Amino acid sequence: MLAYLPDTHAPAWATVLTEEEAHNQGKALVLGWHEGRLSLWPPMGRETPVAVDFLQGALGYRISQGRVKHERLVKAMGRLPNNSLIVDATAGLGRDSALLAAAGFEVLMLEANPVLQQLLSDGLLRLQGQLPLRLITGRAEDILPQLTPQVVYLDPMFPERKKSAAVKKELAWLQYIAPIPSHGEEANLLKIARRAATHKVVVKRPANAPFLGAETPNSQLPGKAVRFDVYLPIS
């Protein structure tokens, strides 16, 4: 479903094609360079490519001084000790991680998908340390037991229908490379996260979505489109 363009450092397992070849062979997406950023887009399509850019565009506006403190995600973290570490165990494109880092938290991103890992790494390279963001590549289920963060943040992919056309497009692209986790996988990740966190686990969910892993949270920050479910640690 995915092809790497020849100008990328493609891993050994990847299919390397030109954009025209990818289109002719029915590949859904290509990974390549667009305007100096490693990006994802449909071959020969007109859609805007997806890249990780922590300081530009809509995300750059949201993390600007004086705005980020009003983000509901930041409010969901509550009061935390100084120098608190937040682990974003489902980093994706890193946007929520950037908001938390801009709010003053130390943020460690975990990402298992190799394509998203490359996009995040490129974004971090261009960020040049301007936000306290780090990335560890690998499965959160394997890495979290080795960490003791104050907060673990989870935002598992969810097939929400009431999204804008642009968000639906991006979500569809991501689902080609990172399928939606099963109920059992979600429940297991939540349990591991609650054992790792010292203060809380914060889960982002569509407002009308079921609880992650069918586990009732200890508290909630509701919203019209998105809510944040808060879980206390378990031993």
Predicted regions: what is each one?
Residues 85, 106, 132, 199-200:
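Residues at the starts of beta-strands that form the adenosine-phosphate
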Residues 156-189:
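Mobile active-site "lid"/loop adjacent to the S-adenosyl-L-methionine
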Residues 86-99, 149-165:
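Conserved proline-anchored active-site loop of SAM-dependent methyltransferases
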Residues 27, 83, 149-152, 198:
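Local beta-strand N-terminus motif with an aromatic residue
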Residues 185-232:
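Conserved Class I SAM-dependent methyltransferase catalytic core
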Residues 6-9, 92, 204-208:
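Short, polar loop motifs at secondary-structure junctions
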